[in-house]
């Protein structure tokens, strides 16, 4: 009897993209965008979404030349050589490590806040870091399948809690706060000086590019429509959700009121506490707490699973208990130690992740496409990008990279 292989539906790829890009990192958006506020933030998020969509489609074009199972290491090495491959490998590892640090920081902060809020017991941030690191490391050590199942539950819980919480807030949005009218604006208010510092946060908010090889592997070279549609729908959904998120936060918390949030470090626990102050209902405040915990926990598991697999492949650790223990140690110990020393760096880490992420999600794809179009006379799929667009994306990528470097050295104006 011939068993017919089931072709994955569009939903599988779309959910992969959505689950990857939408997570705890969205908590950093209102804080990062406070300087330019809602009108400017909406425009920049839209423009960056278009650019990230194009670079994602560029990777699809390149990846399809090599078929399912090929990843960045394969086609970067083949098309651009060993030096480029080393740079991309370092950037890839850096992004995953710094995101692991960011989500350990965010998770530990939210857990500490939740425990103190509902039990009255003060859980020190550093102790919370140890608990989170050991718990997540233990789950990853036990089974990648367990990580996947727990992540699925957390993602469902995250979206249910999100819409249950913020669909009510939409009716309390004040247009005057949203446009920062004179009644709410700070004295001598300015917006343009803060544009550059928002770019790294916007870039990382559409970080699905590492999943393009997974999509190609999922659908195969014959599933081009499902691959591209998954990316289109996932990116569009993320953009709309981010704008909705900014509407309900910036429409309820004025720009002036963001200053004390930022002054406290802008970590997730501080922001969740500020939003919690908007609710008069205890049950809604509880749902918000659940959302905060679900969001960062799902992001932590998803991001660290990618790093876990990358480390195992890089160091050729075996997939038995001993090998997975080594992998877990190399994966979680370095970011946990940094987080123990600097426990409140969630927002800053998300921004710094944009430094390396820009390399392999913005700058790398056009170079790969240029090389692939010279190498291969035909293509299964051609991204909607001519040479002018490819060059423009390279320039923009270089510009974004420069802004992150300037921000590291505190040479960019920051809203506070």
Curated annotation (Swiss-Prot):
Sequence intervals crossing the membrane: 13-33, 34-54, 86-106, 127-147, 153-173, 192-212, 231-251, 260-280, 286-306, 337-357, 389-409
Bilayer topology: Multi-pass membrane protein
Provide one Gene Ontology biological process annotation. amino acid transmembrane transport
- Source organism's superkingdom? Bacteria
Indicate yes or no for the key word rRNA-binding: no
Pfam families membership: Trp_Tyr_perm
Q: Which UniProt keywords apply?
A: Amino-acid transport, Cell inner membrane, Cell membrane, Membrane, Transmembrane, Transmembrane helix, Transport
The cellular component terms of Gene Ontology attached to this UniProt record, alphabetical and capped at eight, are: plasma membrane
- Family membership: Belongs to the amino acid/polyamine transporter 2 family. Mtr/TnaB/TyrP permease subfamily.
Q: Which PANTHER family match?
A: LOW AFFINITY TRYPTOPHAN PERMEASE-RELATED
The name this protein goes by in its record = Tyrosine permease
* Species this protein is from: Enterobacter agglomerans (Erwinia herbicola)
Q: Which gene encodes it?
A: tutB
């Amino acid at each position: 009897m011939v068993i017919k292989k089931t072709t994955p539906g569009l939903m599988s790829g779309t959910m992969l993209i959505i689950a990857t890009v939408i997570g705890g990192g969205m908590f950093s958006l209102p804080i990062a965008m406070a300087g330019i506020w809602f009108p400017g933030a909406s425009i920049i998020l839209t423009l960056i979404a278009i650019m990230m969509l194009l670079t994602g489609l560029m990777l699809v074009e390149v990846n399809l030349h090599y078929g399912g199972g090929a990843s960045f290491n394969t086609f970067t090495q083949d098309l651009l050589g060993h030096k480029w491959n080393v740079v991309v490998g370092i950037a890839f590892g850096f992004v995953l490590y710094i995101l692991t640090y960011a989500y350990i920081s965010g998770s530990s902060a939210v857990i500490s806040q939740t425990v103190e809020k509902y039990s009255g017991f003060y859980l020190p941030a550093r102790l919370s870091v140890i608990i989170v690191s050991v718990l997540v490391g233990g789950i990853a050590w036990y089974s990648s399948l367990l990580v996947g199942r727990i992540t699925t539950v957390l993602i469902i819980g995250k979206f249910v809690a999100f819409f249950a919480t913020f669909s009510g807030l939409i009716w309390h949005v004040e247009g005057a706060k949203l446009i920062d009218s004179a009644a709410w604006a700070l004295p001598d208010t300015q917006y343009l000086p803060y544009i550059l510092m928002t770019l790294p946060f916007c870039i990382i908010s559409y970080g699905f590019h590492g999943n393009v090889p997974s999509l190609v592997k999922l659908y195969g070279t014959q599933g081009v429509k499902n691959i591209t549609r998954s990316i289109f729908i996932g990116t569009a959904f993320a953009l709309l959700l981010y704008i909705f998120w900014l509407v309900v936060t910036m429409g309820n918390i004025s720009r002036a009121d963001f200053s004390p949030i930022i002054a406290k470090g802008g970590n997730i626990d501080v922001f969740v506490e500020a939003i919690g102050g908007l609710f008069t209902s205890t049950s809604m405040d509880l749902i918000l707490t659940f959302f905060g915990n679900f969001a960062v926990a799902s992001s932590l598991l998803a991001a660290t699973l990618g790093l876990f697999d990358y480390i195992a492949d890089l160091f050729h650790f075996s997939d038995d208990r001993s090998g997975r223990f080594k992998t877990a140690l190399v994966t979680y110990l370095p970011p946990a130690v940094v987080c123990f020393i600097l426990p409140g760096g969630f927002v800053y880490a998300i921004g710094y992740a944009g430094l390396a992420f820009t390399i392999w999600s913005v700058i790398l794809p056009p170079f790969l496409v240029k090389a692939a179009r010279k190498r291969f006379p035909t293509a299964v799929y051609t991204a909607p990008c001519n040479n002018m667009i490819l060059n423009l994306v390279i320039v923009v990528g270089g510009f974004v990279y420069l802004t992150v470097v300037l921000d590291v050295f505190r040479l960019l104006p920051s809203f506070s």
